[in-house]
Curated annotation (Swiss-Prot):
Alphabetic keyword roster: Chloroplast, Membrane, Photosynthesis, Photosystem II, Plastid, Reaction center, Thylakoid, Transmembrane, Transmembrane helix
Protein name per UniProt: Photosystem II reaction center protein M
Family of the protein in this entry: Belongs to the PsbM family.
Membrane topology: Single-pass membrane protein
Taxonomy, superkingdom: Eukaryota
Biological source species: Marchantia polymorpha
GO biological process, one term: photosynthesis, light reaction
Summary of subunit composition and partner proteins: PSII is composed of 1 copy each of membrane proteins PsbA, PsbB, PsbC, PsbD, PsbE, PsbF, PsbH, PsbI, PsbJ, PsbK, PsbL, PsbM, PsbT, PsbX, PsbY, PsbZ, Psb30/Ycf12, at least 3 peripheral proteins of the oxygen-evolving complex and a large number of cofactors. It forms dimeric complexes.
Keyword set includes rRNA-binding: no
Length: 34
């Protein structure tokens, strides 16, 4: 059970960190264009 939780956390971080990074870049570009 603990291994599954750790794997879930690792997968969530692996997905969320690049997504957040791309989202921040997108917001910065959008605000610069407007």
């Amino acid at each position: 059970m603990e291994v599954n939780i750790l794997a879930f956390i690792a997968t969530a971080l692996f997905i969320l960190i690049p997504t957040a990074f791309l989202l921040i870049l997108y917001v910065q570009t959008a605000s610069q264009n407007s």
